[in-house]
Structures are given as C-alpha cells and as structure tokens.
Design a protein with these regions (language model features):
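N-terminal cysteine/histidine-rich coordination modules
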Residues: 7-8, 17-29, 39, 57-58
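Structural signal for the C-terminal ends of transmembrane alpha-helices
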Residues: 51-61, 152-159
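A hydrophobic membrane-anchoring alpha-helix module
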Residues: 120-160
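Alpha-helical transmembrane segments of multipass membrane proteins
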Residues: 19-23, 51, 127, 152
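C-terminal TM-helix exit segments that contain a strictly Trp-centered aromatic cap at the helix terminus
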Residues: 16-25, 79-95
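Loop-to-helix transition at the N-terminal end of transmembrane alpha-helices
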Residues: 30-45
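Interfacial segments of alpha-helical transmembrane regions
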Residues: 1-12, 62-82, 148-149
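Extracytosolic (periplasmic/ER-lumenal) interhelical loops and adjacent juxtamembrane/interface segments
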Residues: 93-137
Length: 160
C-alpha cells in the first residue's frame, strides 16, 4: 500500500476514533475520565497530521517527499493513544495504580466545608462501559496498537 494511502487512512482513523468517543459521550452518556481525555489528544493530532498533511501536499504547500514522514507521525500518534489505552485498561483491572487525580478514594463527607470542593469526577479505575468484558480503553488499545502495527508493516513492506 502506498504511503499516501496509509497517511490518509491513519488520519481518517484518528478522526473516526474521536467521533466515536464523542458519540459515546454525548449520545451514549458515557462520561470520559481524565485518562480518556489523554487518549483523545493523540487521535486528534493523528487526524490533523494525516488529513491536514495530505491537504497541504495536494495544495502543493508541502513536498510529496514528506508523505512517508507524515504517515509515520500519524501512526506513532495512534500507537501512543493505544499505549495510554492499555495503561488505563490495566488500571481498570487493578494491575497497577492510576493517577491520583482520578483513582483516589471516594469522597467522604465530614462537614459542610467539604461540599465546596465537590466535583463530579469520573474515576479512571472503574470502566463505565464494557462489551465482552473489555472497556472502551481496552478496545482503544487493541484497535489502535493493531492499526499502528498494520500501518507500519504496510509502510515498510511498500518500500521493498
């Protein structure tokens, strides 16, 4: 497969993942935790690098020789999101601790002053949605790491 197709597919993948996450959030009512937001940024960047890069190449602003670099950048960004998803899935399964900002102890009321600091925090160590025992973070890990590996393999194979 050509580098230009891989670049476009990587950008489209990033965009699709963001749209899917937003769909789960706004249509499905699955609120994201802090680590969920961490996973979104690399997908946004992959969409910008992949699709934006192709737009700049097609407009003649960027030379075509940079297409493989754009593809690699987008694939690395997708892999980063997948790695964060794998980390979050591990936190959900209690394999290792997550960040204190979203896995700390539940709120304990000890007086009226505590109510001024209450926030609706979505915990990172509890999956809000699962399908076949796998959370959204787990699916992001599986799909994104798999897509990045396939894209990288196709780029390497395309050079020979």
């Amino acid at each position: 497969m050509s580098a230009i197709r891989i670049t476009g597919l990587a950008g489209a993948y990033g965009l699709a993942m963001i749209l899917g996450a937003l769909g789960f959030q706004y249509l499905g009512g699955v609120l994201p935790c802090e680590m969920c937001h961490w996973q979104r940024w690399p997908h946004i960047a992959a969409a910008v690098v992949g699709l934006g890069g192709l737009l700049l190449v097609s407009a003649g602003i960027v030379d075509r020789k940079y297409i493989p670099a754009l593809a690699w950048c987008a694939l690395i960004l997708i892999a980063i999101s997948g790695a964060i998803g794998a980390y979050q899935a591990g936190v959900e399964w209690k394999f290792f601790p997550g960040p204190a900002s979203c896995t700390g102890p539940r709120f304990v009321f000890s007086g009226m002053a505590d109510l001024s600091h209450v926030h609706n925090v979505v915990r990172c160590d509890e999956a809000s949605w699962r399908l076949f025992g796998i959370s959204l973070a787990g699916y992001n890990a599986l799909c994104s790491l798999g897509a990045a590996a396939l894209g990288g393999f196709a780029l390497i194979r395309g050079k020979s």
